[in-house]
Structures are given as structure tokens and as C-alpha cells.
Amino acid sequence: MKRPDYRTLQALDAVIRERGFERAAQKLCITQSAVSQRIKQLENMFGQPLLVRTVPPRPTEQGQKLLALLRQVELLEEEWLGDEQTGSTPLLLSLAVNADSLATWLLPALAPVLADSPIRLNLQVEDETRTQERLRRGEVVGAVSIQHQALPSCLVDKLGALDYLFVASRPFAERYFPNGVTRSSLLKAPAVAFDHLDDMHQAFLQQNFDLPPGSVPCHIVNSSEAFVQLARQGTTCCMIPHLQIEKELESGELINLTPGLLQRRMLYWHRFAPESRMMRKVTDALLEYGHKVLRQD
């Protein structure tokens, strides 16, 4: 059985994290040549490339598996080293989360863990349809995803659902939808998406108004909080989690343009198995809070 040297694995990890050999060498306090040699040793051991030398570099499928192994080992080391040592060096936890969870329920859920545990969070924001891929590639140790199927050697639990409403300000609605939301009026109403892969708005319009993708004008803004601001100032109509705009809906600052219609996204918490003690704390906190504030039906 091939057993990798974890020092060489850390070199591979550093190249991916730092997005290049030069910065990886600086991070590890060794020469760039030494980084290359360590990765070459790993590749010789496994008889195949572990790194695609693009800009930035990315791991091969085998490289992803080794990085996932490294993440598990780092977490399990925390389990074995004991409270005295781990308390002096905060444990780094890299998690892949969607922007809407980060803007609504995730940070309050993690607050108790952050208050009494020596950890440093590295929250990597990604669309909920793609967060699981970061776990697969070994970039993170946990992920909030819409995928219900667990990856090999991973665990999964249901968190609950975010309900998205199609909203806008009242002046926006009066301008673009004076006779209600119709297929023809939607073609002129500016919308917003998180990125070019965010299809929630398009999917909602296609499902309920038979509008094909790309048929409405759409801004690209990488911020959940900015969605709310754009809607409040009358710039766009957009899909926003109900949990995020309860006050705006109650005050009338925003209105639900399509009562009775919503887009529901069920979320799941994925992580490596077995769980370390610290990851178990994170899991318990996310599940407890998620079950309180997210839809469970």
C-alpha cells in the first residue's frame, strides 16, 4: 500500500491554496525548487500526475483524493493531540457555503462554536449547486449544498430549505408591472444574478411564465446583500430568500410580486467521515440552528 509523506502532501496543498509554486514556497518557507521536488516525489510514488500545471494550477482526480485525505488527517490530528496543544494553535476549518446561507443563517449558527472553540474559519463562497465539488476536490472539509447524495467517504444531513420570493420595490412594480406580472412585462424588467452560472431567476421565469433562458435583461452582482439593496432602491426585481427580507416585506419596502409562487432550495450539510470532535461541534451547531430557521417540510 502506498503511504504518502504528509510533508509532500502539504506542498501539493500549498500550490493549490496559494495558486502557484512561488507563493507556495513562501508559505512553506522553502525554495520553489523544493516545492517542485516534493510534488515530483508524490507523482513518482503514485505513477501519475497529481497537478495540472495551468495558471492557477489545479489538482488531477488523484490529486483531489490525496488533498481530501490530507484534510481528514489534519482534522483527526486535532482529535488526538488534545486540548492543551490545539488550544494554542487554532484549527483551520475550510468550508464551502452558498452566499445566501452566509447572508442569513450560517453565521448565527456557528456563533456558539466560534465563541468557545479554537478555530479559524475559511469560508469559500460558491453557488449551492457547486459547493460539493469543492469537497470532492479536497479544498474544504465541509460544504452546504443542494445535493442530497453523499460523496464516497463522506456524511450528509438535511439542513432545511430556503424559500426564495420574487420581489421588488413598489415603485419598480408600478413602473414595470402596472397590470401585474406577465410574460410580456417580464421581458422589460431588469433582473439580477449572482454570476453567469446562477440560473435561479431564469428557472423561476421559465417554470412559471415559459420564458426561455437569456430572455430578460440581467445584472451580474456577486453579493447576496447587494440583491436586497438593488431591490430596495428600485433597480431590479429578483429572487431573494424570505428569511433575508422579512422586515422589508413586513414594512412594505419590498413586495412579493408573485404571491403563491416561490422557489425552494433544500440544503444539505456534507463533510468527511469520520468526523473529528471539532467537526462534530460544527455539525451539531449547523443542524440545530438550521432545523430552527429553515423550512423542514
From Swiss-Prot:
Q: Which domain of life is it from?
A: Bacteria
One example of the protein's molecular function in GO is: DNA binding
In this entry, the residue ranges of the DNA-binding region are 21-40
Q: What InterPro entries does this protein's entry cite? A: ArgP (IPR017685), ArgP_gammaproteobact (IPR023490), LTTR (IPR050176), LysR_subst-bd (IPR005119), Tscrpt_reg_HTH_LysR (IPR000847), WH-like_DNA-bd_sf (IPR036388), WH_DNA-bd_sf (IPR036390)
Stretches assigned to the HTH lysR-type domain: 4-60
Q: Does the keyword Transcription regulation belong to this entry?
A: yes
**This protein is called what?**
HTH-type transcriptional regulator ArgP
Q: What is the lineage of its organism?
A: Bacteria, Pseudomonadati, Pseudomonadota, Gammaproteobacteria, Enterobacterales
